[in-house]
């Protein structure tokens, strides 16, 4: 889990 837009996919 990252605090970036990647979090949307997480």
Swiss-Prot record:
The keyword Secreted does not apply. Keywords: Carbohydrate metabolism, Glycosidase, Hydrolase, Polysaccharide degradation, Xylan degradation. Coiled coil: none annotated. It catalyses: Endohydrolysis of (1->4)-beta-D-xylosidic linkages in xylans. Its EC number is 3.2.1.8. Pathway: Glycan degradation; xylan degradation. GO terms for molecular function: endo-1,4-beta-xylanase activity. The keyword Nucleus does not apply. One of its GO terms (biological process) is xylan catabolic process. Belongs to the glycosyl hydrolase 10 (cellulase F) family. This is Endo-1,4-beta-xylanase B.
């Amino acid at each position: 889990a990252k605090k970036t837009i990647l979090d949307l996919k997480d």
